[in-house]
Amino acid sequence: MSKRSVAAARGPPECCDMRGLLSFLILWLLSKKDMYGQEIAKELAKRKGEKPNPGTLYPALRDLERRGLVRSSRHERKTIYKLTEEGKKGLKKACYYFCRAYGEIFREYRDFCA
């Protein structure tokens, strides 16, 4: 089993609280396509190694919507979330920030990301 799959299977390490990255990950996922809540939860679980609690995910989505970064609409019995133009701009700013703040670390440990 690769280093990546071992880490993903266990979730985030105890030393690192990954909750602060939730909004960033949601924006990034919605930049790929519009999604409903359970679909977002599944995609987050693939990347973080654990499915987010609905009590964490849906308040984060509501906050992103309140800030104008995400828009929701009802389709049949599901709520679909879509990235707004403001959300696209916010994601670009966040990517710039993360690259500047963490890029050197990722380059140094790139073998863990492969």
Predicted regions and their residues:
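Basic amphipathic alpha-helical segments that dock to polyanions
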Residues: L57-P59, D63-L64
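Amphipathic alpha-helical dimerization/coiled-coil segments
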Residues: K3, K89-A114
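Beta-hairpin "wing" of winged helix-turn-helix
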Residues: E65-E76, K82
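Short, Lys/Arg-enriched N-terminal segment that forms or immediately precedes the first helix
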Residues: M1-C15
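Basic, amphipathic "hinge/linker" alpha-helix immediately C-terminal to the N-terminal HTH DNA-binding motif
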Residues: E76-C95
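N-terminal helix-turn-helix DNA-binding core of bacterial DNA-binding proteins
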Residues: E14-T56, L69
